[in-house]
Amino acid sequence: MADWVTGKVTKVQNWTDALFSLTVHAPVLPFTAGQFTKLGLEIDGERVQRAYSYVNSPDNPDLEFYLVTVPDGKLSPRLAALKPGDEVQVVSEAAGFFVLDEVPHCETLWMLATGTAIGPYLSILQLGKDLDRFKNLVLVHAARYAADLSYLPLMQELEKRYEGKLRIQTVVSRETAAGSLTGRIPALIESGELESTIGLPMNKETSHVMLCGNPQMVRDTQQLLKETRQMTKHLRRRPGHMTAEHYW
């Protein structure tokens, strides 16, 4: 049984009509950057719960979550309606293996995300530990519209902080936007446009690819890299070149 603790909302940041971030104070156990927990609310006499990744660094007591409101969802519209001072239930112990401990050494670490799945990477990069073993870091955030790139300012801050080691790139699929590539991640890899824009190759000799978000993006990218680059899924018992987390 999960141990639930009561958290208090300290901030609600509405990015768009559908995207928002919750900041919560709660007595949770220490977690590893990249992990997730569960948020819950009592609705009609039962606890409704969903898993959400931590966006904040583990050394930051402001627990931050990046969410999308599902119009007919049972929980997300209620979470979106919370105000500072409101209570929310949080599972105290985090879970998940989408962490740097599970990533083998390589020259270039590619971190590819769609939508709200940018969260785990922001936690990892804000903490900044265990990254010395990579020569290059690449963070790619794909969304439908430029307005959905909620954490671009933080991505730009991190890019400066890493002084040339971190390269960031945004992608939009439903419009063209300055500074963003247009299309979807698998197609941009297939065409070579993503690599030429970043200026680094994505291959099994130099790279490890982390994939987080839309299951279709994850599957399509894995299939493409397997077929065209001979890259394989990374398992503890059989080291490979791709680590993934589906976001629903």
Swiss-Prot record:
Record flagged with keyword Oxidoreductase: yes
Effect caused by changing residue 184 to A: Increases Km for NADPH. 15-fold decrease in catalytic efficiency
Gene Ontology molecular function, alphabetical: FAD binding; ferredoxin-NADP+ reductase activity
UniProt effect for mutating residue 174 to A: Increases Km for NADPH. 13-fold decrease in catalytic efficiency
Predominant place of localization: cytoplasm
InterPro entries registered for this protein in UniProt: Cbr1-like_FAD-bd_dom, FAD-bd_FR_type, FNR_bac, FNR_nucleotide-bd, FNR_type-1, OxRdtase_FAD/NAD-bd, Riboflavin_synthase-like_b-brl
Keyword flag Nucleotide-binding: yes
Enzyme Commission code(s) on record: 1.18.1.2, 1.19.1.1
Disulfide bond entries: none
Binding site residues for FAD: 50-53, 66, 74-76, 116, 247-248
Location in or out of the cell: Cytoplasm
GO BP of this protein: cellular response to oxidative stress; heme catabolic process; iron-sulfur cluster assembly; response to superoxide; response to xenobiotic stimulus
GO cellular component terms attached to this protein's record: cytosol
Domain FAD-binding FR-type: 2-101
Catalytic reactions of this protein: 2 reduced [2Fe-2S]-[ferredoxin] + NADP(+) + H(+) = 2 oxidized [2Fe-2S]-[ferredoxin] + NADPH; reduced [flavodoxin] + NADP(+) = oxidized [flavodoxin] + NADPH + 2 H(+)
Physiological role: Transports electrons between flavodoxin or ferredoxin and NADPH. Reduces flavodoxin 1, flavodoxin 2 and ferredoxin, ferredoxin being the kinetically and thermodynamically preferred partner. Required for the activation of several enzymes such as pyruvate formate-lyase, anaerobic ribonucleotide reductase and cobalamin-dependent methionine synthase.
Name this polypeptide is given: Flavodoxin/ferredoxin--NADP reductase
Source species of the chain: Escherichia coli (strain K12)
